[in-house]
Amino acid sequence: MKCHYEALGVRRDASEEELKKAYRKLALRWHPDKNLDNAAEAAEQFKLIQAAYDVLSDPQERAWYDNHREALLKGGLDGEYQDDSLDLLHYFTVTCYSGYGDDERGFYAVYRVVFELIAKEELECMSEGDVEDFPTFGDSQSDYDTVVHPFYAHWQSFCTQKNFSWKEEYDTRQASNRWEKRAMEKENKKIRDRARKEKNELVRQLVAFIRKRDKRVQAHRKLVEEQNAEKARKAEEMRRQQKLKQAKLAEQYREQSWMTMANLEKELQEMEARYEKEFGDGSDENEVEDQEPRNGLDGKDSEEAEEAELYQDLYCPACDKSFKTEKAMKNHEKSKKHREMVALLKQQLEEEEEQFSGVQMDENVLNANSEEEMEDTPKQKLSKKQKKKKQKSAQNFDDNFNENGTEEGGKIAPEKTKSNEDNAKELENRPQENTCITETTEACEDPKSEAKSVPKSKGKKTKDVKKSVKAPAEAQPVSDVLISCATCHSEFPSRNKLFDHLKATGHARAPSATASLNSVTRNKKEKRRSR
């Protein structure tokens, strides 16, 4: 069978106009009426031209013909197709060549012909615009970079241009409808892709087989290994020389004068002396003592004793810190934090001393006024803010107490109740008691408390009782407060004056328990009588 494009004498990518012109020209030439001398041959040729134009003028027929052109030319689609392509399996053995020379049976000549045939088959399946150059296999003397490497780089990624349409099982022209045609095309496409994949893998495996036995590749690999070994040897030699050079420099190295510790210590001492002279820290005597060498006692015991004395001299009890040098101790004593800690320590000591001196005086007052005994709470260390608050609260309490005492003393009338007079006389007649403070207890009590103490009852009698309670409370004049010392019987206008007197004279002594109990019981009896 002759190719339709060859019958019309056009290229495979010819347009419709070119096909029409070629057909008219050949039809006039081979028409039987114009070839009476050779009518049989002209009729046969005219049939081929007519059939070719009929197929190529129809777009669908032309597309199908392009896809199945190779199969049609080699026997058709009826199963009579014979694949005349090169059998590559024959070249996977070492018996296909003899030696690695350049003769006809040599390794390079045999495989050079094989790849030229494969390239020729691929060019037949390509269009004129898609033609590409296939690198040659070369010979035994070919250069690796210009011939061998490009050849293997191309053929190791080989991809055939054949469509393998002769492998199709279904003729889409015989489909009854378009759905059946699509199903046929889908199955045919799977078959073609499978055949194309097998062809590509076969060629790539052949390339790998040849490359493994190619002497040019082996020589190049050996050359690369030698070059790498030479590079490693040179690198090791350079590293060894560098190490020897560094060792030699280390032997010749000398310490610079500015790096020695002796000069550094001397410069440090000079710097300290300059700063002390400028800012006034330290004295000249201390500088001389620090610069002079210390000729201490010999022996370990003398050194330990010296260190202990130095540690005691350089210890700050206020801040609970120890220092290594006298300069550091002096600088610390000049610091603001040290001065604050010293002032705080003095303040704490003064407060503790005052509290210790006033403990027994407070106990005497509490025992005289009530039966309960107050226990002293342990002293806690307070912060600055807490101490300031405590001092302010104590000062306010004393001021309020003085004001209340003087005001009440001014308001109390000179009239005294019988119970208060008895209490005062009894306290004055006690020689064993040191301190006794007699005040009008009933005058200080609130009239509301007296009114509350009256039992509730209904009727006119309760009203008379309430009036009788309110009347003496309102009409009772306020008496003066009697504050006297039980030892010397001196009277004072306020408690602060009495406390100052007790501190100065030392008359504060604890009263006997029986006397305090008798005074309390007698006061209770007098209250009951007054009710």
Swiss-Prot record:
Gene3D superfamilies, per the entry: Classic Zinc Finger, DnaJ domain
Start-end of Polar residues biased regions: 394-404, 432-441
C2H2-type ZnF: 314-338, 483-507
Extent of Acidic residues compositional bias: 281-290
Sequence intervals crossing the membrane: none
Positions of region (Disordered): 278-309, 327-480, 507-531
Extent of Basic and acidic residues compositional bias: 291-302, 408-431
SUPFAM superfamilies: beta-beta-alpha zinc fingers, Chaperone J-domain
InterPro entries registered for this protein in UniProt: Chaperone_stress_response, DnaJ_domain, DnaJ_domain_CS, J_dom_sf, Matrin/U1-like-C_Znf_C2H2, Znf_C2H2_jaz, Znf_C2H2_sf, Znf_C2H2_type
Annotated localization: Cytoplasm; Nucleus; Nucleus, Nucleolus
Gene Ontology, cellular component aspect: cytosol; nucleolus
Keywords: Chaperone, Cytoplasm, Metal-binding, Nucleus, Phosphoprotein, Repeat, Zinc, Zinc-finger
Compositional bias (Basic residues): 381-392, 455-464, 522-531
Domain of life, per lineage: Eukaryota
Primary role: May act as a co-chaperone for HSP70. May play a role in ribosomal RNA (rRNA) biogenesis, possibly in the maturation of the 60S subunit. Binds the precursor 45S rRNA.
PANTHER family: DNAJ HOMOLOG SUBFAMILY C MEMBER 21 (PTHR44029:SF1)
Protein name: DnaJ homolog subfamily C member 21
Organism: Mus musculus
Taxonomic lineage: Eukaryota, Metazoa, Chordata, Craniata, Vertebrata
The encoding gene: Dnajc21
